[in-house]
């Protein structure tokens, strides 16, 4: 194999393909990145039996071929190269990378021992890359990180015709986002549970593409897989087994109090007051007509109080939240105005965004957050 490719193109492609390489591969070849040069294209692939990634870029190909090299090493080298065209060639058990006056020689791994990448499932539909990335980011923040509860580490993708609903929970908050897309089959109905971290990494990487193709396996080829493709990149991941708790009944539809606050001053106030909140201690919110009073700490230790303008419809209410979970939700609504809707101080509150103080709440994204019970 002998090829020539632009340094930035190579570095970006290698970083994408190598992102899911295992830190401790069960077999040495799984630490490798598979480079294949043919018909004016250089493809780079990785696979760890859970996640596969493949990207194709344009390259000048003098001699076609395939080589398997250490993915992390090639990623480090590609990132450090000067901004000059890069030549990659192979000679038996060695691969050579030349860029300007820099020259690297890498040992190759046995290509014949590398597993075949899983077949991409059939395309299910398409969604604009920015919409997909935004929706995933809004929902994945609520996914659990405890691997002993694998179901809660996933994002649930539910497809009903032209509507897609993403949902995740760690038991302390529940995030749900709906958006429209273009399905291949207008009558499609499907559910999948995708590892949240893999979905986040994929969504970020595919934002540069105009459209993202979502490919969900049915029975047959690619069963138990979901695939994503866009901007010359494709990835598959194995689905998690199980399903999230039935959540639609958890979201209240009637409220005793609804508070409306400008998001930016609310966020800044929570951050300041939380400075005195020790680990896992809550920030207390007291809503009255025209004002929100935030408090944290205790009289025995450091204490903080701040007042923020707020509109309140309904009864006055005092409630407490984990400040990190509250800030996550306020960041995720991505709106200038936040709406918090309450039933009681011991029941979950519903956070959503408004484009303006006097506008209706955006129903596309909902963030349900459990309150922290206060002693006494």
From Swiss-Prot:
Q: Which GO terms describe its cellular component?
A: cytoplasm; DNA polymerase III complex
Compartments annotated for it: namely: Cytoplasm
Gene Ontology MF terms in the entry: 3'-5' exonuclease activity; DNA binding; DNA-directed DNA polymerase activity
The record's Gene Ontology biological-process terms are:
DNA strand elongation involved in DNA replication
Question: Does this entry carry the keyword Nucleotidyltransferase?
Answer: yes
Q: Please provide the record's keywords in A-Z order.
A: Cytoplasm, DNA replication, DNA-binding, DNA-directed DNA polymerase, Nucleotidyltransferase, Transferase
Protein origin, superkingdom: Bacteria
Question: Which Gene3D superfamilies has this protein been placed in?
Answer: DNA Polymerase III, subunit A, domain 2
Please state the protein's primary subcellular location: cytoplasm
> How does the record describe its quaternary structure?
Forms a ring-shaped head-to-tail homodimer around DNA which binds and tethers DNA polymerases and other proteins to the DNA. The DNA replisome complex has a single clamp-loading complex (3 tau and 1 each of delta, delta', psi and chi subunits) which binds 3 Pol III cores (1 core on the leading strand and 2 on the lagging strand) each with a beta sliding clamp dimer. Additional proteins in the replisome are other copies of gamma, psi and chi, Ssb, DNA helicase and RNA primase.
Q: Report the sequence similarity comment from the record.
A: Belongs to the beta sliding clamp family.
Biological role stated in the UniProt entry = Confers DNA tethering and processivity to DNA polymerases and other proteins. Acts as a clamp, forming a ring around DNA (a reaction catalyzed by the clamp-loading complex) which diffuses in an ATP-independent manner freely and bidirectionally along dsDNA. Initially characterized for its ability to contact the catalytic subunit of DNA polymerase III (Pol III), a complex, multichain enzyme responsible for most of the replicative synthesis in bacteria; Pol III exhibits 3'-5' exonuclease proofreading activity.
NCBIfam families found in the cross-reference section: dnan (TIGR00663)
- PANTHER family per the record? BETA SLIDING CLAMP (PTHR30478:SF0), DNA POLYMERASE III SUBUNIT BETA (PTHR30478)
Protein name per the record? Beta sliding clamp
Query: Gene for this protein?
Result: dnaN
């Amino acid at each position: 194999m002998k090829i020539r490719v632009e340094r930035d193109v190579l570095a970006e492609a290698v970083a994408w393909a190598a992102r899911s390489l295992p830190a401790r591969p069960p077999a040495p070849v799984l630490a490798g990145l598979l480079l294949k040069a043919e018909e004016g294209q250089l493809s780079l692939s990785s696979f760890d039996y859970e996640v596969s990634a493949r990207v194709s870029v344009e390259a000048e190909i003098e001699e076609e071929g395939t080589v398997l090299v250490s993915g992390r090493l090639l990623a480090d080298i590609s990132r450090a190269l000067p901004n000059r065209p890069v030549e990659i060639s192979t000679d038996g058990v060695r691969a050579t990378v030349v860029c300007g006056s820099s020259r690297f020689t890498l040992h190759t791994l046995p290509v014949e021992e590398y597993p075949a990448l899983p077949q991409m499932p059939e395309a299910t539909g398409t969604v604009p890359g920015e919409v997909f990335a935004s929706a995933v980011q809004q929902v994945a923040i609520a996914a659990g990180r405890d691997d002993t509860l694998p179901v809660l580490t996933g994002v649930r993708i539910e497809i009903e015709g032209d509507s897609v609903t993403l949902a995740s929970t760690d038991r302390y908050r529940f995030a749900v986002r709906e958006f429209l897309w273009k399905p291949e089959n207008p009558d499609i109905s499907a559910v999948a549970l995708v590892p949240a971290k893999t979905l986040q990494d994929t969504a970020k990487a595919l934002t540069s593409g105009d459209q993202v193709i979502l490919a969900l396996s049915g029975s047959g080829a690619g069963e138990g897989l979901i695939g994503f493709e866009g901007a010359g990149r494709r990835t598959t991941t194995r689905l998690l087994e199980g399903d999230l708790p039935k959540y639609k009944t958890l979201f209240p539809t009637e409220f005793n109090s609804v508070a409306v606050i400008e998001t930016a001053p609310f966020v800044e106030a929570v951050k300041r007051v939380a400075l005195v909140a020790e680990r896992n201690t809550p920030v207390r919110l007291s809503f009255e007509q025209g004002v929100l009073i935030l408090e944290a700490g205790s009289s025995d230790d450091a204490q903080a109080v701040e007042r923020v303008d707020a509109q309140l419809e309904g009864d006055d209410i005092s409630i407490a939240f984990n400040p990190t979970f509250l800030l996550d939700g306020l960041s995720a609504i991505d709106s200038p105005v936040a709406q918090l809707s309450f039933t009681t101080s011991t029941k979950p509150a519903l956070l959503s965004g408004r484009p303006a103080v006097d506008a209706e709440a955006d129903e596309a994204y909902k963030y349900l957050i459990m309150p922290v019970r206060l002693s006494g």
